[in-house]
């Protein structure tokens, strides 16, 4: 069988923060190969699949991944040798069964995901298709709206801003290439605005600026100024999005925000105020991952006006997503393959979300690599949205550049999600 897995190798490498991660290379009988590198998050949900680290304080402060590498070279390779790489669902189920734990803690979700993605890439090469076409078929032609994280706070930056991400959303562009240009031009102007105000232009983990500001609203004001000075119309050409990462704000049942303790109802009232004053289309993790009652109330009050995204709430997990659907908590899901650990489970989460009328956003992590799989995945699944950072740092730009290549390859068949109303909006 030409597409049988013949060998698998793996290496400990570094991510964009200088922390260890791993890559896997899968080789098939016909000579096709697939390389995949896995990312790592800074603000992680409690219910994410387990990222296996060595725990040896003498190496990388315990963050090494040599155990995960050994799991790939040993039991995973033995299990998958001779299996057909074209049967992704079987490959992923074999990996899940081999691990045998609910959260992939024995082999490590990082080891499992690297092999899962590398297998798909090898299979795509074997049949002579780009990854997005191999995964998505003839209807893989929708280019996602990018949610560009240009101002950072929270766990992604060392500053006094509570909200983790302030994003540009170029909904008014005619193509992905134009959307990327919109964002890049505003990002350049934003740097000038910060310099004129004597504010820091140092960047956070995802490439956004991380200045010290008086309030979270001050960050939104900076974005509005930069959009206008770049020659665009806020709300028409470029809208805004937030990732609050409220888990990071929760202490003793209260949300500690701008120096005060707040209830879930207080936070929702605050978001209502922001929506009245700014063209915000999307709020991610506005409340904590176990505040289901708060999420239900927030969705009831705001869900008809804004996209309410569950990241830590759902962690790309089918069980948690189904609970959100059943309880009317959130109306969109952030999709991070490393939260769940296999390509098949990732696609299943997307399918469940779409069936329920939820929007889907394919996402990077704060600790990234030059791997561009999520760009192909966004097009393959017609997700309509992608989060992959700011307009600097090459591990972020790599994904944008891959989307440019895909759009060019599709030619006239390419459709930009923002142009046809498939980007972020209320249900």
From Swiss-Prot:
Enzyme class: lyase
Entry cofactors: Mg(2+)
Binding sites annotated in the UniProt record for (2R)-2-phosphoglycerate: 164, 336, 365-366, 387
UniProt remark on cofactor binding: Binds a second Mg(2+) ion via substrate during catalysis.
Cellular localization per UniProt: Cytoplasm; Secreted; Cell surface
Catalytic activity as recorded in UniProt: (2R)-2-phosphoglycerate = phosphoenolpyruvate + H2O
GO cellular component, one term: extracellular region
UniProt entry tagged with the keyword Lyase: yes
Active site positions: 206, 336
Any one GO molecular function term: phosphopyruvate hydratase activity
Tree of life domain: Bacteria
InterPro entries on file: Enolase (IPR000941), Enolase-like_C_sf (IPR036849), Enolase-like_N (IPR029017), Enolase_C (IPR020810), Enolase_CS (IPR020809), Enolase_N (IPR020811)
Keywords, alphabetical: Cytoplasm, Glycolysis, Lyase, Magnesium, Metal-binding, Secreted
Biological pathway: Carbohydrate degradation; glycolysis; pyruvate from D-glyceraldehyde 3-phosphate: step 4/5
PROSITE patterns tied to this protein: ENOLASE
Enzyme Commission identifier(s): 4.2.1.11
One GO BP: glycolytic process
List of residues binding Mg(2+): 243, 284, 311
Family recorded in the similarity comment: Belongs to the enolase family.
Primary role: Catalyzes the reversible conversion of 2-phosphoglycerate (2-PG) into phosphoenolpyruvate (PEP). It is essential for the degradation of carbohydrates via glycolysis.
Protein name in UniProt: Enolase
Protein source organism: Synechococcus sp. (strain JA-2-3B'a(2-13)) (Cyanobacteria bacterium Yellowstone B-Prime)
Gene name, Swiss-Prot/TrEMBL: eno
